[in-house]
Amino acid sequence: FEFWFAYGRVIPRHGVRVVAALAQLARQMPITLVGGNHDRWARDFWQEDLGIGFAPREARFTIGGTAGVALHGDGITETHWSARVLHRVLRHDSTVALYRGLHPDLGMWLVDRLSGYLGDRPRSPDEVAASAARQQAWATARLAAEPALALLVMGHTHRAAAVSVAPGQLYVNPGAWFDGYRYATVSDGQATLATFTA
């Protein structure tokens, strides 16, 4: 789904199939969703209704003895002042409370109309590459600052990457599921980028 917002008694219609698929998967294995720039306002819906963990900013985890952290990455490496301001405004409790006060039909209509204009989506391949390079540099610095971390997973730029940034430390951006059906796997200290096939 393009956008998720948890209302008290309403589930956004446009994401129902994704939610159903995640609920089914959660019955087979533990899942934690990490909020991004379009879906960090989930409240307790995922956990209470579906048994899916939700981390609005970042999730720390240990899998098979590997310590890692996953975060979306929005608001971290943007260089234009308007993107930084927009992230602060959209994350502010007052903004969220005002939006929650809108009727869900109006709120979702508003998001549909504004989604193409808001945000910090890079406009050219050069901007995408520069944004991905800044994100990787940020991830490398974060891993250097936390040597106990073996894995840092980020998205946001949608530029797939699996990089060993230091001995025993990986930076992974799985890419975008909606643009090439990409994902990543990590096993035995190695990261692999892959593509879903029909």
What is each model feature region?
Residues 3-5, 32-33, 40-44, 122-126, ...:
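N-terminal start-of-chain detector that recognizes signal peptides
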Residues 24-29, 63-66, 98-105, 183-186:
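Short C-terminal domain-edge/linker segments immediately following a structured domain
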Residues 71-135:
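Active-site-proximal loop/helix segment associated with metal-binding centers of metalloenzymes
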Residues 14-17, 130-138:
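Soluble or luminal CAZymes and related metallo-dependent hydrolases
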Residues 3-7, 25, 95-107, 143-144:
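Phosphate-binding glycine-rich loops and adjacent basic patches that engage nucleotide phosphates
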Residues 22-30, 72, 105-110, 126-127, ...:
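Short low-complexity stretches enriched in small and charged residues
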Residues 49-58, 67-69, 74, 78-86, ...:
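Conserved beta-sheet core of the metallophosphoesterase superfamily
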Residues 1-63:
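Core catalytic region of metal-dependent phosphoesterases/phosphodiesterases
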